Amino acid sequence: MTEATLAEWHPLGAIDEFTEDEPAARVAGQKPIAVFRIGDELFAMHDLCSHGHARLSEGYVEDGCVECPLHQGLIDIRTGAPKCAPITEPVRVYPIRIVDGQVEVNVG
C-alpha cells in the first residue's frame, strides 16, 4: 500500500460507539459521513440526501434503509441506491474497516 492509499482511511471512533438504534454523524477527510449499524455490520455513506440535502444521520432507519428526514425518501444503507421518490439519484457509500476495535472509513 502506498502512503496516499493509507492516508485515505480516517478514524470514526470505537466500534462500541455505533448502535443499531441511532445513525451517527462524523466528518472524515472534510466530508460529512453517516454511519449505520445493521446487526454486526457497519456502513458509511455521504451524510447528505441527494434530493434535498438533509442530513441522513438524522433519518429514521428500518429494514436496511434510511428515510430522509426532509421528504421521507428511502435510501438503501448498503448500496446508497434510492428506493422511492422523491429521491432518484444514489448517495455515495464508503468502505469501512475495523482495526483493533476502531472503525475507519475510506473517503478517497
Swiss-Prot record:
Concerning what turns on (or off) its expression, the entry says: Expression is positively regulated by the transcriptional regulator AndR.
Q: Name one Pfam family in it.
A: Rieske
Q: Which InterPro entries match?
A: Rieske_2Fe-2S, Rieske_2Fe-2S_sf
Listed A to Z, the keywords are: 2Fe-2S, Aromatic hydrocarbons catabolism, Electron transport, Iron, Iron-sulfur, Metal-binding, Transport
Name the PROSITE patterns on file.
RIESKE
The free-text note explaining how the cofactor binds reads:
Binds 1 [2Fe-2S] cluster per subunit.
Q: Which residue ranges does the record assign to the Rieske domain?
A: 9-105
Instruction: Name which cysteines form disulfide bonds.
Output: none
Q: Does the keyword Iron apply?
A: yes
Offer an example of a GO molecular function term for this protein: 2 iron, 2 sulfur cluster binding
Q: Provide the cofactor list for this protein.
A: [2Fe-2S] cluster
Could you tell me which pathway this protein works in? Aromatic compound metabolism; anthranilate degradation via hydroxylation; catechol from anthranilate: step 1/1
Asked if the record carries the keyword Iron-sulfur, the reply is yes
Give the transmembrane ranges. none
Q: Which GO terms describe its biological process?
A: anthranilate catabolic process
Q: Where does [2Fe-2S] cluster bind?
A: C49, H51, C68, H71
Superkingdom assignment: Bacteria
Per its UniProt record, what NCBIfam families does this chain match? Answer: ant_diox_AndAb
State its role. Answer: Part of the multicomponent anthranilate dioxygenase, that converts anthranilate to catechol. This protein seems to be a 2Fe-2S ferredoxin.
Per the similarity annotation, which family is this?
A: Belongs to the bacterial ring-hydroxylating dioxygenase ferredoxin component family.
Indicate the quaternary assembly.
Part of a multicomponent enzyme system composed of a reductase (AndAa), a ferredoxin (AndAb) and a two-subunit oxygenase component (AndAc and AndAd).
Official protein name in the record: Anthranilate 1,2-dioxygenase ferredoxin subunit
